[in-house]
Design a protein with these regions (language model features):
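Substrate-binding surface in catalytic domains of secreted glycosidases
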Residues: 149-153, 231-235, 239-356
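Hydrophobic faces of well-ordered beta-strands that scaffold small-molecule active sites
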Residues: 111-115, 138-142, 172-176, 218-220, ...
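Catalytic domains of carbohydrate-active enzymes, especially glycoside hydrolases
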Residues: 125-148, 205-218, 400-409
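Active-site groove signature of glycoside hydrolases
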Residues: 203-232, 282-296
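Acidic/aromatic/glycine-rich contiguous surface patches that form carbohydrate-binding/processing clefts
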Residues: 397, 403-435
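Glycan-binding loop/region signatures in secreted carbohydrate-active enzymes
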Residues: 178-184, 188-189, 330-397, 429-435
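Primarily a LysM-type cell-wall glycan-binding module
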Residues: 1-25, 48-75, 99
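Glycan-recognition patch characteristic of GH18 chitinases/ENGases
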Residues: 104-201
């Protein structure tokens, strides 16, 4: 399976070893091991997807393929494809024949990643994750500055985030929320959006904080607002945009994943896609949590529902304002699902693969959702269902970004190990740096 230009995605089959895979692609054991950060390279999991670092990429001919159809798929001139593979343009291709696909130009996108410290400190693991992945980021977004009911700001621990961003030419994003006592507060949102004095105090504090610390984008993540405050939110954003632009700051917003302007539900109704698309410099669509910790087991960000949200957004705003939200986590559900019962446990893609290996189960792949999953039984006899992300699922999102010419991608959140994502991101795109 193709990745971008210089990576191939290989799904481990029964009998595969890292040595045999390396031989197939003309690379080395060490190169694959390092790229995928394998903790036990001699114990692969059937169904595990690996990224294979090569220059250009290989494609294995499928039934019904012709050289012309393959050249169209990859955007490569058919004559160039024939010449580089030493074959005739009109030569019938055998199924399984390996073609070399030369590199093609990469689209340029922006990349954001939220980073969420817990408690009053930034863990060493989280800071290391920010340091490691900042080269791939346009924006680094510490989550979050909470608002008081008087319009003051309560800062998160920042540690070295500002210097990490500066040293990697990434823009620091100031994330402002209506979180109160650990949950999004409709009442706090109502107070802020209906009181001009508090709004003015809040905007003064935001601008002062941004200038002191070096934030260059202000990102409003106001959720679960009262539906009757929809237009109040729009008016607040208009005022904020004017103030922030005068101060030389960008402004962005986070939007619940809607598929129509009239979608009902407390998460959706106060979010006006058309207004945000008009006012903000860009938006982040929160296109994840179809599978969530308190719900039934399913893919966290299945490709078709994600596409539905983006296609609706495109009817309300230009593609160059849309950042696709992407989870860096999966969930482990205990079966059977019972409403109000035990919450699913979050885990990283790397943790999911290790869990499948330890439980000696194969990883399956849902072609419709474009997501990997597996089942296992724990030591107490409880059945589990795990959905997560892998190289194939993230490549499907990258292909959607390219197809719909979106501004970029926004990750929730750093600190979850998924090395294949960052390699494929760099392989598929040129990442814009704002400096």
């Amino acid at each position: 399976m193709r990745g971008g230009n210089g990576l191939q995605i290989h799904v481990v089959k029964q009998g595969d070893s890292l040595y045999s895979i390396a031989s197939t692609y003309g690379t080395t054991y060490d190169a694959i091991n390092v790229a995928n950060e394998l903790d036990n390279p001699n114990q692969l999991v059937v169904g595990q997807s690996l990224v294979i670092p090569i220059v250009g990429q290989f494609y294995f001919v499928q039934p019904g393929d012709s050289l012309y159809s393959i050249s169209q798929r990859f955007g490569v001139n058919v004559q160039e494809l024939a010449e580089i593979n030493n074959i005739s343009q009109n030569q019938p291709l055998e199924v399984g024949f390996r073609l070399y696909i030369p590199e093609i130009p990469e689209p340029t996108i922006e990349v954001n990643a939220y980073v969420e410290p817990t408690g009053n400190t930034v863990s060493e693991t989280l800071e290391n994750s920010a340091q490691k992945n900042a080269p791939y980021l346009t924006y680094l977004a510490p989550f979050n500055y909470r608002i008081t009911r008087e319009g003051e700001l309560i800062a998160p621990p920042l540690n070295n985030f500002a210097s990490i961003a500066a040293n990697n030419n990434a823009t620091l994003m100031l994330v402002v929320t209506n979180l109160e006592e650990g949950a999004f507060s409709a009442e706090l949102g109502r107070i802020i959006l209906t009181n001009e004095t508090i709004q003015n105090n809040l905007l003064n504090n935001i601008i002062e904080t941004a200038q002191q610390i070096g934030f260059r984008d202000v990102h409003f993540d106001f959720e679960f607002l009262p539906p009757e405050n929809r237009e109040d939110y729009n008016n607040f954003l208009r005022k904020a945009k004017e103030r922030l632009s005068t101060a030389g700051l960008l402004m962005s917003t986070a939007l619940a994943p809607k598929t129509s302007a009239t979608q009902e539900g407390e998460w959706y109704e106060a979010h006006d896609y058309a207004a945000h698309g008009e006012i903000a410099d860009f938006v982040v669509l929160m296109t994840y949590e179809w599978g969530y910790s308190g719900g039934p087991a399913m893919a966290v960000s299945p490709i078709n529902p994600v596409r539905d949200v983006v296609e609706y957004a495109l009817t309300e705003m230009p593609s160059e304002k849309i950042m696709l939200g992407q989870n860096l986590y999966g969930y482990d559900w205990t079966l059977p699902y019972v409403a109000g019962g035990e919450y699913a446990k979050a885990l990283s893609p790397q943790q999911a693969i290790i869990l499948a290996r330890d439980e000696n189960v194969a990883i399956e792949y849902d072609q419709e959702a474009q997501a990997p999953f597996f089942f296992y039984t724990d030591d107490e006899g409880n059945r589990h269902e795990v959905w997560f992300e892998d190289a194939r699922s993230i490549q499907a999102k990258f292909d959607l970004i390219k197809e719909l010419k979106l501004r970029g991608i926004s990750y929730w959140k750093l600190g979850l190990a998924f090395p294949q994502n960052w390699l494929l991101l760099e392989d598929n795109f040129t990442i814009r740096k704002r400096g």
